[in-house]
Amino acid sequence: VLGTDSNFLDSSNYFTFDYRQDNLVTAVNVSDKDAIDPIMYSDEFRLNYFYEVFKSYLWGLNRIEEQDVSKLVRSYIKTIKTDIHDRLQLNTIRTIKCHPSGPCLAGVNRLFVTVEGDFFPCERVNETSKAYNIGNLDEGFWYDKSYELLNIGKLTERECRECWAINFCNCCAAGIEEGDKLSRKKRLEKCKSNKHVVEERLKEYCTLREYGCKFED
């Protein structure tokens, strides 16, 4: 997790050149969810980070070698492939019944169990909210709660039906609670930022394709 007090370059150089060369390294920025104060990054951090992202573009275009790109951003091109290219290949046709991508099968891959024995879909949700509690050690899984978290598109049914980014949606149930209920308002707020990210990724994808990046490889 990259803190706001770093300049990115120090962390990048350490994990790319000083840390064990055969280890896989990924990085995320500090989450701003429920932050009391806004998360701010210095100009130096942004400059160093986006310079490495630009180098990842060059790597994707075979202009430089993989070892010349920071380990902290090597997954960037792969993320564009997964989030944009691979989904475009599906040629999904919207039918009478459809569902936005984004939600996982609650508790299947990353089940989180509290010390009290309560089940939650993963470690990213708010375990103080009953909206995410999907069972416990004594009673097992509450499948109706898991279904509710999977079918969060029901909260914004009309908007999802008309959304151009429905097949690129990454909005899961995490972060849309209000007390012990899932919030339609918070889901729409999350949707707005998700569409902005998708739009930027589409621009990157189209530019890289135009300059010869082979996402099929």
Report each predicted region and the residues it spans.
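Radical SAM/AdoMet-radical enzyme domain recognition
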Residues: 1-35
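C-terminal accessory region of radical SAM enzymes
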Residues: 46-95, 123-170
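Active-site rim elements
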Residues: 98-100
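Short, small/polar residue-rich loop motifs at catalytic or cofactor-binding pockets
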Residues: 104-107
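Radical SAM enzyme core and accessory elements
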Residues: 116, 130, 155-217
